[in-house]
């Protein structure tokens, strides 16, 4: 007896089963089987990143060194995330520490003054190599994170110095973090990072600078933290999932397109040069067969003599009657020859549109706007420019918070510990916790970098004033958007007002208006009080 077959329900195409057709198409063969050959392996981040880690970073380095758009992308990160001065805004958690707000503000003023003296010293005492100020180190860290996906800073102690502070920092290239003797990865040592069973980093293997390459390479193990909790080696990157050991550079998703765009630009430039080389051509009556006989039969003695003789006749003729394009004389050509002037041709041929399409794709992968990446602001309205700038600003603020500020805060904590021990700054006496007991509370701070790009200065100021007047923002926030510290602005305004008054100058319009408004308001309050009485 034949077993009956159960009919299978098919999808609208009459071939795919309804169960497969009704599911997620991304996991199937796709429309027309277009996804059938696309079978990427399911891997962890380390499994996908670390086998080709060195090559990927080397390619990113090459792009930044030799590709203008890649170099501009790194410059955008530095200018918009950090700017020219990375300013400390110290904010100890005074409620948690059990101190008063005024005590906390007084302590913060002492800390900020001492930190600026140490961090922005023109002698670069903060840097082991004596090449960088603190802001320069943050700018380098942001650039390093962009094209290497991570940044490393080593906190050191200068025992031979006679300076007040012994804390120093060394910027460490990610290229120097690798397994000892370039051995393969293991469960607890991956790409130069020693980790515990939970995946937390315990220490790092740092190789010496191998240039010029004739000395044997040596590795030094540096712990992540010292026994007292002080940071010894700072490693900042943004993991995308659990178990990730090293960071992935921002160019991975657009690396192929950037390299091909480089090749395309070079080819287009060569084509334009070739077209511009020939202003005119002379065509001879020599037919194709005779020309091929000359070329293909040049190995025989007879053909070589014929070819040499023919070229000699042409050379002798034009030597006696040269062809000139810049003169007024109309030249006489050799009988049978014709002069063809080459008109200028369009070397673009749709290239600009194609380049814009590629640059938009690259800009999306790098997190910046097309206009910023290409430096092309033509045909943009105010609304379009503002929307584009706001999108990039949100990206840059995220990077400032999770990359630049993390590096800066950990460096600041190392210095603050020494400043407290040396009594350069004094903790409030009524504090509930010591520095070692509440490092994060004492070192809590914000960092003010470059301001948001102003598309229309007048409209930006009007917006800030309206937000403050409506109670939706504060002077602190609006000044921070412009890259300024509101306390410094207020203090400077007071000084300038007093100096103008001492010099017999009128106060600025805003100050006069504010004074009149305050006087009018106080007068009205006095009148209302008198009526009530």
UniProtKB/Swiss-Prot annotation:
<keyword id="KW-0167">Capsid protein</keyword>
<protein>
    <recommendedName>
        <fullName>Portal protein B</fullName>
    </recommendedName>
</protein>
<feature type="site" description="Cleavage; by viral protease">
    <location>
        <begin position="22"/>
        <end position="23"/>
    </location>
</feature>
<keyword id="KW-1188">Viral release from host cell</keyword>
<keyword id="KW-0238">DNA-binding</keyword>
<comment type="function">
    <text>Forms the portal vertex of the capsid. This portal plays critical roles in head assembly, genome packaging, neck/tail attachment, and genome ejection. The portal protein multimerizes as a single ring-shaped homododecamer arranged around a central channel. Binds to the terminase subunits to form the packaging machine.</text>
</comment>
<dbReference type="GO" id="GO:0005198">
    <property type="term" value="F:structural molecule activity"/>
</dbReference>
<keyword id="KW-1160">Virus entry into host cell</keyword>
<keyword id="KW-1171">Viral genome ejection through host cell envelope</keyword>
<keyword id="KW-1243">Viral long flexible tail ejection system</keyword>
<dbReference type="GO" id="GO:0046798">
    <property type="term" value="C:viral portal complex"/>
</dbReference>
<comment type="subunit">
    <text>Homododecamer. Interacts with the terminase complex composed of two small and one large terminase subunits.</text>
</comment>
<dbReference type="GO" id="GO:0019068">
    <property type="term" value="P:virion assembly"/>
</dbReference>
<dbReference type="InterPro" id="IPR006429">
    <property type="entry name" value="Phage_lambda_portal"/>
</dbReference>
<keyword id="KW-1162">Viral penetration into host cytoplasm</keyword>
<keyword id="KW-0946">Virion</keyword>
<comment type="similarity">
    <text>Belongs to the siphoviridae portal protein family.</text>
</comment>
<keyword id="KW-0231">Viral genome packaging</keyword>
<dbReference type="Pfam" id="PF05136">
    <property type="entry name" value="Phage_portal_2"/>
</dbReference>
<dbReference type="GO" id="GO:0003677">
    <property type="term" value="F:DNA binding"/>
</dbReference>
<keyword id="KW-0118">Viral capsid assembly</keyword>
<dbReference type="GO" id="GO:0099001">
    <property type="term" value="P:symbiont genome ejection through host cell envelope, long flexible tail mechanism"/>
</dbReference>
